[in-house]
Structures are given as C-alpha cells and as structure tokens.
C-alpha cells in the first residue's frame, strides 16, 4: 500500500510506544510525537495596558514578565486553527521550516548582551 508520508505523520522511529498528551484545544489524546507543537511567548500584560503599567510602576527600568506556553494540538485542531495546512504531494517532501513571521515595521533583533 502507498505511504502518504515518509515518517507516517509522527517522529517515533525505533520506539514501540510514546506517551499520549492531551490536545490544548479539544483535549483529545494524541501521541506526543504526533502532536503539533507551538511554542508561544507572550507578554503577561496586553499591548493596550503596557504603557499604563510602566508609568504607574515604582521601578523605572522594570521589565514586564512574559508568559511561556507550549501548545499541543491534535492534527484536526491544528488544521482547523490554521497552525498547519495540507500541502500537495510534492510540497510534503519539503522539510524546511516555514519563514518566521516578523511585522513589517519591526527592527531586527539585537544580539544578546554578554554577562
């Protein structure tokens, strides 16, 4: 029978079993290696309130903390929420990650400061 994908839609190679995780969206059980993972870094405070909080802060150079979340989606939720989309037979073989989204007016990120 023909195969749709070289990796059968998952990252399990020599392992017999992979522990299941729950989809963030619908709570369906999905094998951890098959789940579509999305790492999100957001400010805890929404963009509209950042200036108000920084002005009200006692500390002048206080950096607002960020929220680091790894979202796990089942295949159907990832397609529905447009995290991934179905691709043609030839495009499926392309393993390069999609280009990183940067807003048009954003400056390139400065290099990290040495400690």
Curated annotation (Swiss-Prot):
Keyword Nucleotide-binding: no
An example molecular function term from Gene Ontology annotations: structural constituent of ribosome
An example Gene Ontology CC term for this record: ribosome
InterPro entries documented for this protein: Ribosomal_eS26, Ribosomal_eS26_CS, Ribosomal_eS26_sf
Biological process terms in GO annotation: cytoplasmic translation
Region annotated Disordered, chain positions: 85-115
Chief location bin: cytoplasm
PROSITE patterns: RIBOSOMAL_S26E
Regions of compositional bias (Basic and acidic residues) in chain numbering: 87-97
UniProt KW keywords: Cytoplasm, Endoplasmic reticulum, Phosphoprotein, Ribonucleoprotein, Ribosomal protein
Record localization: Cytoplasm, Cytosol; Cytoplasm; Rough endoplasmic reticulum
Matching Pfam families: Ribosomal_S26e (PF01283)
Record carries keyword Ubl conjugation: no
Positions of modified residues (Phosphoserine): 54
Quaternary context: Component of the 40S small ribosomal subunit.
Task of the protein: Component of the small ribosomal subunit. The ribosome is a large ribonucleoprotein complex responsible for the synthesis of proteins in the cell.
Family according to the record: Belongs to the eukaryotic ribosomal protein eS26 family.
UniProt protein name: Small ribosomal subunit protein eS26
Organism: Cricetus cricetus
Lineage, opening ranks: Eukaryota, Metazoa, Chordata, Craniata, Vertebrata
Gene name per UniProt: RPS26
